[in-house]
Amino acid sequence: KDFEDIYLYWFNKETFKPDYLAYKFYVDGGGIRFRVAYNERYLGGIRFVDYENYEATLRDSEFYDVDVFYERNKLKLLSKIELEDISVKPSN
């Protein structure tokens, strides 16, 4: 059922990097999540970021406006996704 998930990405107009992402999922009762990237770092030329993970209790028609709800502080912070002890090993 994951194949039905819908994803949205917001790219920074100056850096062309994704600042936010949102997704609507249907498994286990479904829901909407909104993630905000922070703590950008590069290791071995690969970009890594952490995320603030928000829950959005919205109607289906509001999904495409989830960023507006974030900007108005209308989303609930569920967790932080923080990458630790990252290592990048070159392959041959």
Predicted regions and their residues:
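Gly/Pro-enriched, hydrophobic low-complexity segments
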Residues: 1-86
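Short, solvent-exposed mixed-charge patches
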Residues: 91-92
